[in-house]
Amino acid sequence: MKNEVKKVVLAYSGGLDTSIILKWLQDEYNCEVVTFTADIGQGEELEPARKKALSLGIKEENIFIKDLRDEFVKDYVFPMFRANAIYEGEYLLGTSIARPLIAKTQAQIALQTGADAVSHGATGKGNDQVRFELGYLAFNPDLKIIAPWREWDLNSREKLLAYAQKHGIDISKKKGKSPYSMDANLLHISYEGLVLEDPAHAPEEDMWRWSKSPKDAPHESEIIELDFQKGDLVAINGEKLSPAGLLTKLNELGCKHGIGRLDIVENRYVGMKSRGCYETPGGTILLKAHRALESITLDREAAHLKDELMPKYASLIYNGYWFSPERMMLQALIDESQIHANGRVKLELYKGNVMVIGRQSANDSLFNAAYCTFEEDEVYNQKDAAGFIKLNALRFIIAGKNGRKF
């Protein structure tokens, strides 16, 4: 394949690994390289990536830096939160949900520039290789895919550094750079590697980059109100913001109060178990509020069906199937359930906790105090319950009369 590739679009961060990949592609494939850097809210200055690419011989017209923050939240994060998606009961899918957008945009740039190949920096052990490549092939099945970590022999940090030094690639560490393997976007930041590879070893406090420790969070709680329309967040404390602005604001609130830290061992799609630590402050608040709103606006059976389907939906995202027909089918059902998910939720934030203290919907609430009151009412005849119970017990009654014991 090396002689067949003429132009490749590389998912490029400007960091050491992808800079080495850039040079390796030039040397091994002797092809033209286009770099694509996505701004999905990782909180880093992206212009250095442009300068780094230029220093490695990339033409100015072959450098793409795109601000995808609003698209990321509006078209990926919000649809996922309509489903209340959680993988294996805990993980809010912060890395998983970012990969489809990057892959789609990378494939679009390949089409725009006439590139016949794409490349990424995911290793052969992780989930990201699957997520990226399923995304590429969903948009262009004819694209050639170059995954250097599955091809080269630079399989240690020492070999990577030696390669970088040999080719004049800057290997100086940024001041304050974490030794952990990290991935960040507007939804979360993740940490892997080093002491975390021992699941019995507690992470150091200085690992956490975003949030205060709950122990150091303010001693006073904070009350906030979130407004939703059709299941999506539209305002915080009455202030309407862009999708990216809303999630940024929620992150600020969550970090201030020590909300959203997670330490888990998860089952990777490729078959191994992996330990990761995550901070998802805004997403943790959003999930709690959205479920509270659904508690008054969704029909019982619709809510229960959603809960049954959610693990499948979450697994599809985790495993890289965002663009699959089955995910889109589930999304259509989920979105239909959100037509009446309109209203306001009041929350109290305090030392790592998110507590629902109120929920209301002017036109879509199914909560009717007249039916559920403990006081005297005129709308519900309690005698009707006897027949309801007897009908539901009929199979037990028949079995009992036949001598069957439970």
From Swiss-Prot:
The record ties this protein, via PROSITE patterns, to:
ARGININOSUCCIN_SYN_1 (PS00564), ARGININOSUCCIN_SYN_2 (PS00565)
Q: Which residues bind L-citrulline?
A: 91, 96, 127, 131, 181, 190, 266, 278
Catalysed reactions, as listed in the record: L-citrulline + L-aspartate + ATP = 2-(N(omega)-L-arginino)succinate + AMP + diphosphate + H(+)
Q: In which pathway does it act?
A: Amino-acid biosynthesis; L-arginine biosynthesis; L-arginine from L-ornithine and carbamoyl phosphate: step 2/3
* Origin: domain of life: Bacteria
Gene Ontology annotations for the cellular component aspect, listed alphabetically: cytoplasm
Positions contributing to L-aspartate binding: 123, 127-128
- State where ATP binds: 11-19, 38, 121
E.C. number: 6.3.4.5
GO MF term list: argininosuccinate synthase activity; ATP binding
A Pfam family annotated for this UniProt entry:
Arginosuc_syn_C
Disulfide bridge partners, by residue number: none
Q: Which Gene3D superfamilies match?
A: Argininosuccinate synthetase, chain A, domain 2, HUPs, Single helix bin
Please give the biological process terms from Gene Ontology that the record holds.
argininosuccinate metabolic process; L-arginine biosynthetic process; urea cycle
Q: Where in the cell is it found?
A: Cytoplasm
Q: Which UniProt keywords apply?
A: Amino-acid biosynthesis, Arginine biosynthesis, ATP-binding, Cytoplasm, Ligase, Nucleotide-binding
The record's similarity note reads: Belongs to the argininosuccinate synthase family. Type 1 subfamily.
Concerning PANTHER family, the annotation shows:
ARGININOSUCCINATE SYNTHASE
Write down the NCBIfam families for this protein, in alphabetical order.
argG, PRK00509.1
Q: How does it assemble?
A: Homotetramer.
Give the protein's recorded name: Argininosuccinate synthase
Provide the species name.
Campylobacter jejuni subsp. doylei (strain ATCC BAA-1458 / RM4099 / 269.97)
- The primary gene name is argG
